[in-house]
């Protein structure tokens, strides 16, 4: 892992991470940083790790501990004896999204092909964020990679299954959003009010088109 650290306000440090790390390695990093004293929050994305400290914690003093953890975790990853407990999620989807026809047109595919490609890909949780329980799932099939919508919607319905860039994801709650809507998750909630986010870094996710449950 890259060890370059920069202050992020007066209560946090941010480290830039190298390209190519998988979700499991990010999960190990998250758990190592979260266990440090005076750390109140850790956000690990594909490109950065943000470590938020409790108010009043000396920034420079915490830097050394964070740098040591980054170095230790990085060095241990190839032979890490304790791998994180990764889970696999199957998400049933009703492919009724408002943008399905538009995505098919932009991709040069039929709507059925879009559904088959999206549901036929295995995804990994690359990052968590944006909303509680929202998982950025990679890697979307290149045939479906599109930029975000030019004008975000003021309200995306809860449980919408959507795509943007190389990612797909499920909106846990209704919110503004600029992703392309392909469908609606059925019988799946990305956020549990008691337990928090259902998915974690490194977890695997597969979407199943409604009506094809038995085929899977």
What are these regions (language model features)?
Residues 1-216:
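Glycine-rich active-site loops that engage anionic ligands at enzyme catalytic sites
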């Amino acid at each position: 892992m890259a060890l370059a650290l920069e202050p992020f306000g007066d209560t946090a440090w941010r480290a830039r991470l190298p390209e190519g790390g998988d979700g499991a390695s990010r999960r190990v990093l998250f758990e190592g940083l979260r266990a440090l004293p005076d750390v109140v929050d850790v956000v690990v994305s594909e490109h950065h790790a943000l470590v938020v400290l409790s108010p009043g914690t000396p920034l420079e003093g915490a830097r050394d501990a964070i740098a040591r953890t980054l170095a230790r975790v990085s060095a241990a990853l190839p032979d890490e004896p304790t791998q994180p407990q990764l889970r696999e999620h199957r998400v049933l989807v009703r492919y009724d999204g408002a943008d399905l026809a538009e995505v098919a047109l932009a991709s040069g595919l039929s709507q059925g092909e879009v559904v088959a490609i999206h549901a036929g890909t295995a995804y990994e949780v690359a990052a968590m964020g944006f909303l509680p329980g929202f998982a950025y799932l990679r890697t979307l099939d290149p045939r479906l990679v599109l930029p975000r919508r030019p004008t975000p919607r003021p309200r995306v319905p809860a449980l919408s299954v959507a795509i943007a860039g190389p990612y797909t994801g499920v909106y846990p709650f209704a919110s503004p959003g600029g992703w392309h809507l392909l469908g609606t998750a059925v019988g799946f909630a990305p956020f549990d009010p008691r337990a928090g986010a259902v998915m974690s870094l490194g977890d695997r996710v597969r979407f199943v088109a409604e009506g094809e449950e038995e085929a899977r």
